């Protein structure tokens, strides 16, 4: 084999080895990113929830004041994921808290929301997304002048959906002591008051 052909062959061999190595890395990475236990969704078909509707069709209001619509139930995902929408929100929000075992994602659909995650402050406007990792204290409040809408996703679902349903059974906001007890019963800890909103 002459030098020119050897260089071409060596270059081709190096490229093949690199691609093979990358494929192996990609395969290992995908495997590492897969959930530890994937049992599949509980439902075996698509779940469609129209705008303005709740997954299970009933009207829900947290503490009798915050409209809520379940979009994806933990029952749909075998507990892997839960998503809900706060629509037509007025000013205010929950107390500062943390989740022991769940990450939370917020997506602003309408209006303006103030957030604090750890020591960082954010303002979410339509189209903005914010991720709050488990074990990091966070608080948020709707601060807009017109009604707002916020989509929230919880991963894994855990008992958060049950917390939401129990909160919807209450007709008025809980006292700070009642909120602490309720949050604690569902894997969360209240660590401060709600954000002040003018």
Which residues fall in each region the model found?
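Acidic/histidine-enriched, glycine/proline-rich intrinsically disordered or flexible terminal extensions
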Residues: 167-198
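Histidine-centered catalytic micro-motifs
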Residues: 95-101, 139
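N-terminal export signals
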Residues: 2-28
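A short glycine-rich, His/Asp/Glu-containing loop-to-beta-strand
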Residues: 60-96
